[in-house]
Amino acid sequence: MTPNTQSDIPDPPALGKPLTRSFFGRSVHDVAPDLIGATLLVDGVGGIIVEVEAYHHTEPAAHSHRGPTPRNMVMFGPPGFTYVYRSYGIHWCMNFVCEKDGCAAAVLIRALQPTHGIPAMRRRRRLHEERLLCSGPGKLCAALGISIAHNALPLDAPPIAVYQRTGKVDVVTGVRIGITKAADLPWRYGLKGSRFLSKPFRSAES
């Protein structure tokens, strides 16, 4: 029997103020933790950001480290735009471009707590379990219908909207996941205690 996709869905929480592009014009290390608890919606579907990673052109794990290419060109542009790429030729990943024009820094959105449009997410993922719908960068892009068509789009105009968090959150930090270069940098940020993370933070991380 197919589980009911409506009765187990709570009303979405109230949204904060929309974030403007100026929010993203700061250091990637300020933007990344400040995004924890914010809400990302794409065509009205999305949720609370619970996990992100920061990337900067000065370190070798960043796509922008070796300079601009047709693929990463948007990272070298102004802040407040999306950078969408395909990972390993399989999954789409969404980043938010940060810092001033030319700095080539971005925040990878790694996990969401689903709050808006959950039935649509379940259809797209062919999965019912809410905890697993957006528990990874590729998973959340599939759930929100994100593709290369969403690359280089402004974060403050339809179909994308990002809303500031409405209360205090406890942010934990740790090393980034799935990389071999600059793997010791503690540039992963998450919502402490969230069950929607892509992977738990180690007890030694804080």
UniProtKB/Swiss-Prot annotation:
Instruction: Please indicate if the UniProt record lists Membrane as a keyword.
Output: no
Tell me which Gene Ontology terms the entry assigns under biological process: base-excision repair
Question: What is the top EC class of this enzyme, as a single word?
Answer: hydrolase
Question: Pfam families in the record, alphabetically?
Answer: Pur_DNA_glyco (PF02245)
What keywords are annotated for this sequence in UniProt?
DNA damage, DNA repair, Hydrolase
Q: Which SUPFAM superfamilies match?
A: FMT C-terminal domain-like
Q: Molecular function terms in GO for this entry?
A: alkylbase DNA N-glycosylase activity; DNA binding
Q: What is its EC number?
A: 3.2.2.-
InterPro entries given for it? Formyl_transferase-like_C_sf, MPG, MPG_sf
Q: Which family, according to UniProt?
A: Belongs to the DNA glycosylase MPG family.
Return the protein name: Putative 3-methyladenine DNA glycosylase
